UniProtKB/Swiss-Prot annotation:
Domain BRCT, first and last residues per copy: 341-440
SUPFAM superfamilies reported in the protein's UniProt record: BRCT domain
Described purpose of this protein according to its UniProt entry: Component of the NOP7 complex, which is required for maturation of the 25S and 5.8S ribosomal RNAs and formation of the 60S ribosome.
Cellular-component GO terms for this entry: nucleoplasm; PeBoW complex; preribosome, large subunit precursor
UniProt cross-references to InterPro entries, sorted A to Z: BRCT_dom, BRCT_dom_sf, PES
Similarity section: Belongs to the pescadillo family.
Bias kind Acidic residues: ranges: 467-498
Organism: Meyerozyma guilliermondii (strain ATCC 6260 / CBS 566 / DSM 6381 / JCM 1539 / NBRC 10279 / NRRL Y-324)
PROSITE patterns: BRCT
UniProt keyword terms in alphabetical order: Coiled coil, Nucleus, Ribosome biogenesis, rRNA processing
Record lineage: Eukaryota, Fungi, Dikarya, Ascomycota, Saccharomycotina
Assembly behavior: Component of the NOP7 complex, composed of ERB1, NOP7 and YTM1. The complex is held together by ERB1, which interacts with NOP7 via its N-terminal domain and with YTM1 via a high-affinity interaction between the seven-bladed beta-propeller domains of the 2 proteins. The NOP7 complex associates with the 66S pre-ribosome.
Gene: NOP7
Protein name, as recorded: Pescadillo homolog
Length: 585
């Protein structure tokens, strides 16, 4: 039997250090990082670092050796090498002053495509949809970022265009389900082909970009994510029979911008090869037929049918087959296009959005719920550029006006005045909430996260109401016990000799008088004591390891429950104070 050589099997063979990987691939460290991001290869942690590093204990980054071997055959790697030689040739030509050669080299710059990488990493379309949260967050971040020396204007504009195309599709198909306005930005959740997609849109405030951020890595992720979103949007638009990329209204884009600048057209409306329907081909004169002419034509058809029948041939009645199972259980009702309650929530309303309200957030929410809106900013723009069209505007159809001011100077009759939070809360609820608590100047109800805290405190749950009832019952029991104690104390104070006599009788029988008073105050129920005994018996049957784990779990559960009880009590106190103030007013 041969002795195995050290470092040829096990962890030493399965793992490779980053330095060894860079040498093997013959690329720079920056290109190696880009390649790993594109291919989804990340560092690994071996069980025994010392064995993996062949006896060394120095801090090293490890990768799977098979992953690095897989990268050797990557077409993008060859393009990186070509770009390296191209950069050397271009630098040499510019150093010699050969401008024509430099221009020729620039025109033949090596370019690579990530299409095959997307297909490898996401074999099915649903896989791409499941992984869409991070790409959307990154693209919306760059879309709201100002152009700097590290991030060019072209990158931010491309990111903004992709984000608007995504928002336009979600609004057109009415896929939005949840909205939460937080300190970081606005969280949205949409249901796309059965997959929940959640993303964050930052506020459009001037941002200070930190200096310690590595933009090279972020730009690599952005490049990959933008390619992925192009694929996803193309597929989604095609499935919805829409043209991709959507046409852009340049005048609106220069003015207000936003979703109104993106015009989503179906393929049927643009394609000239698709034949028109028969109704469209008929002439206007042919459609205007009298009732007499129609009846005459029907009678003539019936006569022709009677003449075609041969004389002497008996008419045979066909058998009628009826279904034995008359139940309609097998007939599945097909869902309509807008089956969700949120998709048609604002379909009957027209909103007038004031200039003090963020238009981009409300425009997306209202359009996604089937509503229509008129913005004050758009009207100002129309008044300056097209005064004749502004005069012909009909504002009588407006049902709601969204205001973010404490008072409204002049109100228009027939309009309901609300604050922006009514839109978000109604969308999260899936139904129209009462407008009274959202009127201008009113103290708004708390805007809570629609996703809530997993196994945490939910102020709108039924548990809080049950907790209130339990607390009230406990308070009543305490009051009853106190009353009994007071009733017992009064005669004792009046007659001390009787009290001493009772104590002596208790001591003689072997029972302390103080124990009886405590038992009355506690009053434990039989059900609770039986449950506690059962728990204790189960604990006895556990091993030490199981008991420790159980105690840790119970500690965490009790901590959460105490926190929930504290918050519930706090809420009840606030509600009581509010009720008292309302009574005083």
């Amino acid at each position: 039997m041969r002795i195995k050589k050290k470092g040829t099997s096990g962890n030493a063979k399965n793992f490779i250090t980053r330095t060894q990987a860079v040498k093997k691939l013959q690329v720079s460290l920056a290109d190696f990082r880009r390649l790993c991001i594109f291919k989804g290869i990340y560092p690994r942690e071996p069980r025994n670092k010392k064995k993996a590093n062949k006896g060394s204990t120095a801090p090293v980054t490890f990768y799977y050796a098979k992953d690095i071997q897989y990268l050797l055959h990557e077409p993008v790697l060859q393009k990186f090498r070509e770009h390296k030689t191209f950069a050397k040739k271009l630098q040499r030509a510019l150093g010699r002053g050969e401008v024509s050669d430099a221009a020729r080299l620039e025109s033949n710059r090596p370019k690579y495509s990530l299409d095959h990488v997307i297909k490898e990493r996401y074999p099915t379309f649903l896989d791409a949809l499941r992984d869409l949260d991070d790409p959307l967050n990154m693209l919306f971040l760059f879309a709201n970022m100002p152009a700097t020396d590290k991030v060019s204007h072209r990158i931010t504009k491309d990111a903004e265009k992709l984000c608007n195309q995504w928002l336009a599709y979600v609004a057109k198909e009415r896929l939005i389900k949840k909205v939460f306005v937080s300190i970081k930005g606005v969280y949205y959740q949409a249901n796309v082909m059965g997959q929940e997609v959640r993303w964050l849109v930052p506020y459009k405030f001037p941002t200070n970009i930190p200096s310690d951020v590595d933009f090279r890595i972020m730009m690599t992720f952005l490049e990959f994510y933008s390619t992925l979103l192009h694929f996803v949007l193309y597929k989604l638009y095609n499935n919805a029979n829409l043209i991709y990329p959507p046409t852009i209204d340049i005048e609106k884009l220069k003015g207000i911008g936003g979703l109104s600048a993106y015009i989503l057209q179906t393929k049927d409306s643009v394609n000239p090869l698709i034949p028109k329907t028969k109704a469209a081909q008929t002439d206007a004169a042919g459609t205007k037929l009298d009732d007499k002419e129609i009846s005459k034509a029907i009678e003539a058809d019936q006569k022709d049918d009677d003449e075609d029948v041969e004389p002497g041939v008996d008419e045979v009645e066909l058998d009628e087959f009826s279904a034995t199972n008359k139940t309609t259980g097998d007939l599945l009702s097909q869902p309509s296009q807008y089956a969700s309650p949120t998709s048609t929530l604002f379909s009957k309303f027209v909103f007038y959005v004031g200039r003090e309200v963020p238009l981009d957030i409300l425009e997306f929410c209202i359009l996604s719920c089937g509503g229509s809106l008129v913005s004050e900013i758009a009207m100002d723009d129309l008044k300056i550029n097209h005064p004749e069209a502004y005069k012909n505007l009909d504002l009588s159809t407006i049902t709601h006006q969204i205001v973010d001011r404490p008072k409204v100077a002049s109100k228009v009759a027939g309009r309901t005045y609300i604050q922006p939070q009514w839109i978000f809360d109604s969308l999260n609820q899936g139904s129209l909430l009462p407008v009274n608590s959202y009127a201008p100047g009113e103290t708004l109800p708390p805007h809570l996260s629609p996703w809530g805290d997993a196994a945490g405190y939910d102020p709108e749950s039924k548990k809080t109401e049950e907790g209130e009832q339990e607390d009230e019952e406990e308070e009543e029991e305490e009051v009853e016990v106190e009353e009994e104690d007071e009733n017992q104390e009064e005669p004792e104070e009046e007659d001390e000799d009787v009290k001493e006599q009772r104590e002596l009788e208790m001591e003689a029988s072997g029972v302390k008088f103080s124990d009886t008073v405590e038992d009355k105050k506690k009053k434990p129920s039989k059900k609770r004591s039986a449950e506690e005994e059962e728990k204790d018996l189960k604990k006895i049957m556990m091993t030490n390891k199981q008991r420790k784990l159980y105690n840790k779990m119970q500690y965490g559960i009790n901590k959460k429950e105490t926190r929930q009880d504290e918050l519930a009590k706090k809420r009840r106190k606030i509600d009581k104070k509010k009720a008292e103030l309302q009574k005083l007013n």
